Amino acid sequence: MITVGLLGCGNIGHIIAKHQKSFTITAVYDQIEARADDLAAASDAHAYTDFTTFLSADFDIVVEAASITAAQEYGEAILRSGRDFVVMSVGALSDTVFRENLVQTAKEMGKKIYVPSGAVMGLDNIKVGQISTINTFLLRTTKSPASLSIKADSPTMIFSGKAHECIRDYPKNVNVSEALTLAAGHEVDVELWVDPDTDRNIHEIFIEGEFGDAYIRVRNIPSPDNPATSYLAALSILTLLENLDNPLVIGT
């Protein structure tokens, strides 16, 4: 059974801890001791607040469920410790220099960097963009105005541009666009909308190319314990972990 070191003890960490089947959490790390202790107790794991000591513990893979900053700060050390690395905060990889250095380190160490599908679906087949022509590639995200701390009386587009521009202007809304860009090998165009009549995050993907065309719409249910977290994003990590040692590989 795969053993997991969990980096970050927030809402997603607790969801992972509640659904251990084909994996076991043996160590958890958080800078806040109470959070680490709480999750450790829930998962029968050891708690750490010192990262170096955490890395000395016995586990096979590290799952980052903390933040972009944490992924960038600890990613290289995790790979150099001989562990594969699951990056939930995929927005960390929007930094080209960081991403290239991290990939090079993974190659040197013979390790893998895993990016879960997160809050969207269809990420596997979007990878056809790496080997075929993509003509149109658009992500339209719609959120409630309150989630972005703005006011709007009707559906309003507040951003239209390339993914890297959206990351600059709306850094808390980068994970989906970066996951799509990495999957396709092609930067996605982004529209960000607010709609006072929606209480969920909606992601619509429009893609057309050599393969044909597709439209994907995901209306996310918030995590039961944290409305700011997509429940689908948490489930995507669980799916990844459950299938790591499955001899039957499904999907591209």
Regions found by a protein language model. Give the residues of each.
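Short, hydrophobic beta-strand segments that form beta-sheet elements in well-ordered domains
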Residues: 6, 26-30, 62
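Beta-loop-alpha module in the N-terminal Rossmann-like domain of NAD(P)-dependent dehydrogenases
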Residues: 49-80, 92-96
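Active-site-lining helix/loop region of Rossmann-like oxidoreductase modules
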Residues: 113-114, 119-252
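General beta-strand structural signal in soluble alpha/beta enzymes
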Residues: 64, 87, 113-117
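NAD(P)-binding Rossmann-fold cofactor-contacting core
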Residues: 23-40
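Glycine-rich adenosine-cofactor-binding loop
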Residues: 3-16
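A short helix->loop->beta-strand "cap" motif at the edges of active sites that frequently abuts
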Residues: 45, 81-84, 108-111
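Rossmann-fold NAD(P)-binding glycine/threonine-rich loop
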Residues: 90-110
